[in-house]
């Protein structure tokens, strides 16, 4: 199975380093655009700003407390697939283009009130692979985000913000909760969020309903798919920290390896990152899940660990090794031991072909990243996939079953290699080209 990817991304944003020499700084690009703070442009003479910066901070009052920031994000991606789904049942080869446009307005009305709005148009050309144009591919003219913030000052260094409306979530390294920037249509939720910011802690507490894509109309929240929780980040030092989280998911009519019913699942997790030395970084994350699916109780867990080594004498070159494990069921029906990956950005951790997700999986991987010029970066990654438990299924990046569990089959899934080249055309435009190949062990093939 082979996948060729090429994409061009354009964003109205400015790299921080380009403006620091002028005596002011602008924020680095964040896919969650509402996290960008452009208030640093307050008081800067507009004649000193770059043309694209002038729409990022427009004063609406003489004192500068009322202002608006406009921005956007355009992406076009070409995909070429060969032997998709290993040549069965049909339409194994195809090429198509995906398009996505995002435009936002960030209104600041005084120091406490804020309104953030973002519209989206996601479309796809003729996709003849199984599933055709899927909900993750197509969502035409939709309100992606529309929320109101009200911020209280607790003291000179701490604030408490209440957010109500349609919003994107992205916590930690996006292993469990992500707006899914790789997918064309993205994710979003309707809900309420509280955000506590102190010099040492950032705490999000939230209650929401997921918004599935309605390809025939506007998206509406699904009261049968709810997400709530608390996500706290503690700063330990400049290069280290700890995250603690509790995530509550409630869904109707789900099935895990033969156990069906309504799901009520709690995820308790912790993530820690830091440095061993000037050249060696590390990260670990673990989570345990409890609850019930129908009449079956839930007991599942995940763990990931990664070390990153900065290669001496090489320009921004890094070599990394990682282990990802997520539990599976040891027998069908009854107690559920399959980890639920929730709303992940699995594409970033289990290969770009998206055959594998964070459920019933062991992935041993290595990656090498290097900068070959000021504008060009190359990354190569190798994944070795195994099912954690032979009696459970192989699940893809979306949580769908690729192959049902079979205790008599080998746990060996196969190997994937991903090669990516990215080129920065300008501060606002980046292009990338990727090639991914996967070799699947014969017993794992779904057909």
Language-model regions, residue ranges each:
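Outer-membrane beta-barrel architecture
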Residues: 56-60, 102-104, 147-149, 193-195, ...
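N-terminal periplasmic/intermembrane-space "pro-region" immediately following the signal or transit peptide
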Residues: 5-93, 315-322
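Surface-exposed loop and membrane-interface regions of Gram-negative outer-membrane beta-barrel proteins
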Residues: 80-99, 107-158, 175-178, 255-257, ...
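Single conserved hydrophobic/aromatic residue that forms the stacking wall/gate
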Residues: 438-447
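Extracytoplasmic loops and strand-loop junctions of Gram-negative outer membrane beta-barrel proteins
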Residues: 52-56, 84-89, 129-132, 174-177, ...
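Extracellular/periplasmic loop regions
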Residues: 23-41, 45-49, 258, 285, ...
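Signature for the C-terminal beta-barrel architecture of outer-membrane proteins
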Residues: 154-162, 175-332, 391, 404-419, ...
């Amino acid at each position: 199975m082979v996948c060729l990817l090429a994409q061009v991304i354009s964003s109205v944003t400015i790299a921080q380093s380009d403006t620091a020499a002028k005596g002011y700084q602008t924020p680095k690009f964040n896919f969650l655009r509402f996290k960008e703070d452009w208030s640093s442009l307050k008081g800067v003479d507009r004649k000193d700003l770059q043309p694209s910066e002038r729409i990022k901070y427009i004063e609406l009052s003489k004192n500068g407390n009322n202002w608006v920031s406009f921005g956007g994000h355009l992406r076009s991606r070409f995909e070429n697939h060969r032997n998709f789904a290993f040549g069965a049942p049909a339409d194994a080869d195809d090429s198509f283009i995906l398009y996505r446009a995002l435009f936002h307005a960030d209104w600041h009305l005084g120091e406490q009130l804020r309104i953030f709005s973002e519209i989206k148009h996601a479309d796809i050309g003729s996709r003849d692979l199984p599933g055709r144009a899927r909900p993750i591919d197509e969502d035409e003219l939709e309100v992606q985000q529309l929320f109101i913030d009200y911020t209280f000052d607790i003291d000179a260094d701490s604030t408490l913000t209440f957010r109500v409306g349609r919003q994107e979530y992205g916590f930690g390294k996006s292993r469990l909760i992500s707006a899914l920037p790789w997918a064309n249509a993205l994710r979003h939720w309707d809900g309420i969020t509280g955000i506590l910011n102190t010099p040492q802690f950032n705490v999000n507490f939230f209650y929401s309903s997921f918004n599935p894509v309605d390809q025939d109309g506007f998206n509406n929240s699904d009261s049968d798919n709810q997400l709530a929780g608390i996500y706290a980040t503690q700063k330990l030092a400049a290069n280290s920290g700890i995250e603690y989280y509790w995530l509550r998911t409630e869904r109707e009519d789900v099935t895990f390896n033969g156990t069906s019913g309504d799901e009520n699942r709690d995820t308790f997790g912790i993530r820690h990152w830091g440095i061993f030395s000037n050249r060696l970084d590390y990260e670990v994350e673990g989570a345990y899940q409890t609850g019930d699916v129908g009449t079956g109780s839930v007991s599942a867990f995940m763990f990931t660990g990664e070390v990153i080594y900065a290669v001496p004498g090489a320009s921004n070159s890094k070599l990394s090794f990682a282990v990802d494990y997520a539990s599976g069921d040891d027998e069908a029906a009854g107690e559920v031991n399959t980890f639920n990956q929730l709303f992940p950005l699995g594409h970033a951790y289990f290969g770009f072909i998206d055959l594998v997700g964070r459920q019933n999986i062991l992935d041993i991987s290595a990656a090498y990243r290097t900068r070959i010029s000021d504008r060009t970066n190359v990354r190569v990654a190798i994944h070795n996939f195994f099912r954690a438990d032979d009696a459970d299924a192989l699940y893809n990046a979306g949580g769908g079953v690729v192959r049902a569990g079979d205790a008599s089959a080998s746990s060996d899934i196969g190997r994937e290699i991903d090669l990516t080249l990215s080129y920065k055309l300008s501060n606002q435009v980046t292009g990338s080209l990727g090639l991914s190949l996967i070799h699947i062990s014969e017993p794992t093939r779904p057909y």
